[in-house]
A protein has these predicted regions:
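Pore-lining and gate-forming transmembrane alpha-helices of multi-pass membrane transport proteins
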Residues: 123-150, 154
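Lipid-exposed faces of alpha-helical membrane segments in multi-pass integral membrane proteins
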Residues: 2-5, 91, 95-101, 138-142
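Hydrophobic membrane-targeting segments
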Residues: 1-20
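Predominantly long cytosolic amphipathic alpha-helical stalk/bundle segments
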Residues: 14-101, 105-119, 148-169
Length: 169
């Protein structure tokens, strides 16, 4: 939950609204006001603005070197978008397995009861079956939202990469 909240806050602070930002930057840039374009980038202070600022900062380089600088900055910024995605993926894949482990231990408990009491008393089996169902449900209740959150965060990251490619490279 902490990872999801942190990612929500990050994406809220860094919306992928590159069109409005780029319109302002291009206006200043093509008017020859490079300093104003840089000020717009600094005031925006988003990952896309940082990539564009890196390019403006290195206008004296040749085209290929300028693109390299922007690619390097884009890679730094993409890492900000991808932060904790591996952890979310791990949580999403492991929690159903932990639930399955609980299912197995619950069934083992049920069979242990059968071996000692016999099958005549269904209430004796209920504890093991209940354990199996609760742990399965718990694993799914954590795993499914984690998978949804991971996919959403991954989509936001891809959206950012596409914006960088469209506007800067």
């Amino acid at each position: 939950l902490a990872i999801v909240i942190e990612r929500l806050r990050f994406y809220h602070r860094n919306p992928n609204n590159g069109a409005a930002f780029m319109k302002k930057v291009k206006g200043a840039f093509f008017a020859g006001n490079y300093l104003d374009a840089m000020k717009i980038c600094r005031s925006e202070n988003t990952p896309l603005a940082n990539v564009i600022a890196a390019g403006i900062d290195h206008l004296d380089l040749g085209k290929e070197n300028l693109l390299d600088v922007m690619r390097q900055e884009a890679m730094v910024q993409v890492k900000k978008y991808e932060r904790h995605l591996g952890k979310l993926a791990t949580i999403a894949s492991i929690t159903p397995l932990l639930g399955l482990t609980g299912t197995v231990t619950g069934m083992i408990s049920s069979f242990a009861v059968i071996s000692t009491v016999g099958i005549g008393d269904p209430t004796a089996l209920a504890g093991g079956i209940s354990e199996a169902l609760y742990t399965t449900a718990a694993g799914l209740m954590v795993g499914i939202p984690a998978l949804v959150a991971h996919n959403w965060c991954e989509a936001k990251s891809l959206e950012f990469v596409e914006q960088v490619e469209m506007y800067s490279l």
